[in-house]
Amino acid sequence: GLNILLGFAGQISLGTGAFMGVGAYSCYKFMTIFPDLNILICVVLSGLVTAFVGMIFGLPSLRIKGFYLMVATLAAQFFLEWAFIRIPWLYNYNNSGGIEGPNRELLGFIISGPQSEALTRYFVCLTFLVLLTWLASNVIRGRIGRSWMMIRDMDIAAELIGVRPLTAKLSAFAFSSFYVGISGALMVFFWLGAAEVESFDINHSFQYLFMVIIGGLGSITGCYMGAILVWVIPVLIKEIGKTAFGFDAFVMENLSIILLGFMIVVILIVEPHG
């Protein structure tokens, strides 16, 4: 989702973590308000809600860009974090302030909740991954995708040849937020099982930004490569440090962060395009 916005449309955002939270909390509300509604439909609806929210926060992109747009999306990140904490209706007035996925069935299989199996949840996420990748590939190759890339490369020239910045930029924010919202719902209800507002903080926004930068802007395949590097390499470093050298887990936690940052710097120097 972030690569669609940043890599193809050239609009930077530091609010990815918060928009994932919008998707997660929206899905939670759909499941609690409509308990008989299929959870997969709730996930898609949460993506649509996030697309609408993303389009609203994308309005500043019509007047500003670059560093100033980054600051505007950072403000959206902090505002949404505040909303997740200060609006109890979003988490059904739970004392913990968190949201938790209930057990839901599909075709006789429990696909979410504490009683679901990890393999079942994996196949649900894999199905969404394949379908959304196919959709993104087709949209990017179409008229909408070409308008995003023209706005990214030279917005004034794009406007002169008939591309409307209003439509192109807001559609990029909406489409990107749709993907981010679905990923937030899948993360909470098909992986973590439960989450609090800390799961959607600014640190996660930076983490997703690093994935896109490492993988390469404007590359769908690069998104997956960047995600693998950011997620898998720290795990490997921790395991090697504990098993081979006997280092403490706390030491390896901090060492993995340092090495990941060093790796990002090296990749940006050697391969600036990812």
Where are these regions (language model features)?
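Transmembrane alpha-helices and adjacent helix-loop boundaries
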Residues: 1-274
